[in-house]
Amino acid sequence: MIVKYGGNAMKSLDLRRAVARELGTLRGAMPLVVVHGGGPVIERELAARGVASEFIGGLRVTTPEAMDVVEMALCQLNKQLSQDIGQAVGLMGRDDELLRAEVLDPQLGRVGRVTGVNAGLLRTLLGAGLTPVVGCVAVGEDGEALNVNADTVAGAVAGALGEGAVFLTDVDGVYRAYPDPDSRAAQLTRAEVEDGLAAGWIAGGMIPKVRAALDALGRGAPFAIIASGMTAGVLAQAARGEAGTRIVP
């Protein structure tokens, strides 16, 4: 199973370590690949160095100067997460060309779209009983680093390995009538998600989350789950279908 971890769930050190412990425990039941972003950490490091943050369409404009800071921040976070999980191998997407990408839009600078995953490397590590922890910096066609979206990376890795993806976020699933707690959908098909987007009951911050789930399905993942990363124990519950929203083809 591929677990995408990031965002607000990373802001609390105690919560981050609790999730890492859960990942370490769950690894005994199933092979795991962890994909992480680092938005809050990156913001802090950029601000500390006086590098301005600019976004276009929700994506960070990444100058060469900003790319250096992004890669440094993700490397530090990658090492910390790997240590917290235990029996894990921290990898950046540039290691052994784990993640290959092309420039998404010249206006965004060093921002990429994933075009390939070194699935063989991941399978080798999983076969050795290790948990790959992947930071989202890819190698571009020019050999230089590209900043890639963690949700998209998780979907690409899930598709390359033929495994399901779990997107840990700050909400506990997709609701048909948010915030009514009884309206959380346990499972949705791709068609139902598209209907929800068209009808407007999937809206706001949930839109990019379900888009990431649909992208994972489109890349070959058998399912994608959106679940809360703010609650201890949710990963095992989501794997059993007891938490979050499972999206299927």
From Swiss-Prot:
<dbReference type="Pfam" id="PF00696">
    <property type="entry name" value="AA_kinase"/>
</dbReference>
<dbReference type="InterPro" id="IPR001048">
    <property type="entry name" value="Asp/Glu/Uridylate_kinase"/>
</dbReference>
<feature type="binding site">
    <location>
        <begin position="38"/>
        <end position="39"/>
    </location>
    <ligand>
        <name>substrate</name>
    </ligand>
</feature>
<dbReference type="GO" id="GO:0005737">
    <property type="term" value="C:cytoplasm"/>
</dbReference>
<dbReference type="InterPro" id="IPR037528">
    <property type="entry name" value="ArgB"/>
</dbReference>
<keyword id="KW-0963">Cytoplasm</keyword>
<feature type="binding site">
    <location>
        <position position="60"/>
    </location>
    <ligand>
        <name>substrate</name>
    </ligand>
</feature>
<dbReference type="GO" id="GO:0042450">
    <property type="term" value="P:arginine biosynthetic process via ornithine"/>
</dbReference>
<keyword id="KW-0067">ATP-binding</keyword>
<comment type="function">
    <text>Catalyzes the ATP-dependent phosphorylation of N-acetyl-L-glutamate.</text>
</comment>
<feature type="site" description="Transition state stabilizer">
    <location>
        <position position="4"/>
    </location>
</feature>
<keyword id="KW-0547">Nucleotide-binding</keyword>
<protein>
    <recommendedName>
        <fullName>Acetylglutamate kinase</fullName>
        <ecNumber>2.7.2.8</ecNumber>
    </recommendedName>
</protein>
<comment type="pathway">
    <text>Amino-acid biosynthesis; L-arginine biosynthesis; N(2)-acetyl-L-ornithine from L-glutamate: step 2/4.</text>
</comment>
<dbReference type="GO" id="GO:0006526">
    <property type="term" value="P:L-arginine biosynthetic process"/>
</dbReference>
<feature type="site" description="Transition state stabilizer">
    <location>
        <position position="209"/>
    </location>
</feature>
<dbReference type="InterPro" id="IPR036393">
    <property type="entry name" value="AceGlu_kinase-like_sf"/>
</dbReference>
<keyword id="KW-0418">Kinase</keyword>
<feature type="binding site">
    <location>
        <position position="147"/>
    </location>
    <ligand>
        <name>substrate</name>
    </ligand>
</feature>
<dbReference type="GO" id="GO:0003991">
    <property type="term" value="F:acetylglutamate kinase activity"/>
</dbReference>
<keyword id="KW-0055">Arginine biosynthesis</keyword>
<dbReference type="InterPro" id="IPR004662">
    <property type="entry name" value="AcgluKinase_fam"/>
</dbReference>
<comment type="similarity">
    <text>Belongs to the acetylglutamate kinase family. ArgB subfamily.</text>
</comment>
<dbReference type="GO" id="GO:0005524">
    <property type="term" value="F:ATP binding"/>
</dbReference>
<keyword id="KW-0808">Transferase</keyword>
<keyword id="KW-0028">Amino-acid biosynthesis</keyword>
